[in-house]
């Protein structure tokens, strides 16, 4: 059994990680930390987990206990993993970080977007960006994995086939993305209140969202050159889900784009390229570690519209983290992740 530690288990990504690992036949959660809830039983805080973690309680982070684990997940706000990851890596413990701490390879760029100096720039050379559909072989050998964000996951998987094939005008990419309210986290905030977010939709961070440099970094690597991206996120009145509507102009209209996408993702267990003319729904991936994609060329022109949907807490966070765990430890990549989406 893989001995697992979780730092920061009281947020939405933390409890989703617990839910998924409860069904994992090769993983056992030995340590889960929370300074604010130390001593509280996991099953008392999350009744949905009763019968799965009845002997497990939250504890104050302890380097010795965490260092005795085979792998530690960080489901924490940005900056926390900076302080603890180095010590764990030195102890031989693998680290899978769900925060943004190691996603960007440029420490100065990270500081610009996150409003503080990068706390562990010396570890960036060891960090592997945990998008399995791109970095599977690097993940197998990794010590430190940076799990991609939710918007970056949906957006990159939608654009990748076009950019890798050199078919898109990389200077004019548009990502029009919608997120459920759980993407804002569990902390109390006026904008996340039911009366504020219900029956309403709005764009936000149009000037620049923290996920912009992460998306741009991935798309630039896929294209092999600089890219131009306009990324506009929106908050929608649903709990879970990301819906990305992606626009690109193709430079060769003779290419069969449906075949291109189907071939690119034919061997990917968690990317579903839907039949031509489809319109994927966020509810079809609720609770599932799946990205569903459909590709369109309206009126047969040179503008391509890619529709990409994920559950922001699963393929956009905790499910992708478990997918990385499976790859890292040489397990079947689908282990513990074969859940179908929840309907209705």
Curated annotation (Swiss-Prot):
Cellular localization per UniProt: Cytoplasm
Claim: Protein biosynthesis is one of the keywords in the record: no
Gene3D superfamilies: Dihydrodipicolinate Reductase, domain 2, NAD(P)-binding Rossmann-like Domain
Pfam families associated with the record: Semialdhyde_dh, Semialdhyde_dhC_1
Record-listed E.C. numbers: 1.2.1.38
Enzyme class: oxidoreductase
Family classification: Belongs to the NAGSA dehydrogenase family. Type 1 subfamily.
Protein name: N-acetyl-gamma-glutamyl-phosphate reductase
Source organism (scientific name): Pseudomonas putida (strain ATCC 700007 / DSM 6899 / JCM 31910 / BCRC 17059 / LMG 24140 / F1)
